[in-house]
Amino acid sequence: MFLGLRTVIYHAPDLAKAKAWYTAAFGVAPYFDEPFYVGFQVGGFELGLDPDVSGVTVGNNAVAYWGVADIERAHAHLLAHGARESQPVKDVGGDIRVATVVDPFGNVVGLIQNPHFTAEA
């Protein structure tokens, strides 16, 4: 029935700026680019940008954690692109490390380095 998470949507009232920021920060171009939604394919998942923020408290939602191989490098990379640190890299046990940053649009972006978990295609 459930196949796993497929899409994370961040709300960004300035879609053009958000598209440029995520293109540079994640190093991929959008595969879907419309005035009402921009979608990126990132490691088998979709990152969506939605400019409609009506009824949304930006940054006060569930936090999606993007899997990374080198969390120190990924964390520094996002900070260098203008993200603001929310939670520094920390070990949460079992060699699992997490961190969060806030993108320029107020969305919390989680990072996780977990040697025990491999996403299925």
Task: Write out the residue ranges for each language-model feature.
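N-terminal beta-strand motif that seeds the catalytic metal site of vicinal oxygen chelate
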Residues: M1-K19, G44-E46, A62-A64, P115-A121
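Conserved active-site tyrosine of GNAT-family acetyltransferases
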Residues: A18-T23, L78, G106
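Short beta-strand micro-motifs in enzyme catalytic cores
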Residues: V38, A62-A64, D95-A99
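Vicinal oxygen chelate
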Residues: H75, H81-A121
